[in-house]
A protein has these predicted regions:
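Active-site-proximal alpha-helix that buttresses catalytic centers in soluble enzyme cores
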Residues: 1-188
Length: 188
């Protein structure tokens, strides 16, 4: 969850205050309606940082890839960079080959109990219309290359679709299917 990520950052960087801002107004509105919790959007979070006298702004997005929301975030931060002495923006989770390898290690370690040859292990991400959607195909290719032949990667909103994953699973003679998220938040 986002809260667990924030807690880990606070522990790792105790000299910094951790604050939350979401890029999706749809999610902000949903959380407000469901939980009556107000979350800043990017503009509000940046304004709050300026008003609080923040000198060094460090932004660590929880995006999986360099998609449209990440690009919009980077652009908005750049427009406001003069309001701070220093601005640092982290990269999304799946940026370098080493990132992919680390995620593959984490997800296969977390699901190894299911990897019995009779179970298809499927990970679903959000997906995007942007070129960055290729991270899902790359993840699938790397899983296959590393011998994880019972692992499948798909997306909710793009390619490979759920139907694509189901078709691949049907090609095997699996007795069970395990479905896991490849996302931080559920989205809209």
């Amino acid at each position: 969850t986002i809260g667990a990520i924030e807690d880990a950052i606070e522990k790792a960087e105790p000299d910094f205050s951790v604050r939350r801002g979401f890029t999706s107004q749809i999610i902000i509105d949903h959380v407000k309606k469901r939980d009556d919790v107000t979350i800043d959007n990017v503009t509000e979070a940046l304004d709050r940082a300026v008003n609080n006298g923040v000198k060094t702004l460090v932004v660590q997005p929880t995006h999986l890839m360099n998609g449209l929301e990440y690009t919009d975030l980077v652009n908005e931060i750049a427009e406001n960079a003069d309001s701070f002495e220093k601005v640092v923006v982290g990269e999304p989770l799946l940026t370098s080959d080493d990132d992919f390898k680390a995620v593959i290690q984490a997800i296969t370690d977390a699901t190894k109990e299911y990897d019995d040859g009779e179970t298809a292990i499927c990970f679903m991400g959000h997906g995007t219309e942007a070129d960055s959607n290729q991270v899902y195909a790359k993840m699938q290719d790397m899983l296959t290359e590393e011998g994880f032949e019972h692992y499948y990667v798909g997306t909710v909103e793009a390619e490979p679709s759920l139907d694509d994953v189901i078709a691949k699973v049907k090609e095997g003679e699996y007795k069970k299917v395990v479905l896991e998220p490849l996302m931080i938040v559920a989205g809209d």
